[in-house]
Amino acid sequence: TDKDSYNIAKAFEEAFHILKCPIDNYEILDDRPLKEIPKKLEALLPGKTIVLNIIKAVPEEIPFRIKWIFKVEENKKIKMGHMPGITEGMMLNSVNVDFERMKQTAIFLHKSFLNAEKLHITTEEGTDIFLGVKDRIFSNDISIKAGEMCNLPCGEIYCAPLESEADGVIVFNASIGDIGVLKYPLKVYVNKG
């Protein structure tokens, strides 16, 4: 964790104490942005089964985060919750959900995509895109197995569409990763992928 995400990490720590789960914390101090995995952080990995990345989203740290994810995934026993940029509002409104209900909805949606060849996605904000998905594998991040990771908040069902079969417009009107909340909608026009 870090000073910006301390309260969220503390909430997880309190929950783990209630569950009698042993924990180790690593706090990133002011040495930002991280470029490499700190040795003391890496030294905490042996014997762990859960790793939570509760940190401020610093765009310049994306290469570090990728290295860290790969390092954690080397141990096929660890489940990782990845939360760069998580806020208390996200914890209260997006993470505080009925996960069993979310999982059942994801299973239903996943089944509905089996054998799909093309998706047509529209929104009131103006997204109108066709995606070719024939023979693509759909995944979700609702439940993970040892050796896997997911972002929190979670709830995604996704696949990699065919690279040459995407046509239309996508409207981004909320937040984009580490960039934050957009002031104005961003339209991206896609032609043949």
Where are the predicted features?
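Active-site bordering "gate/hinge" segments
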Residues: 1-169, 174-178, 183, 191
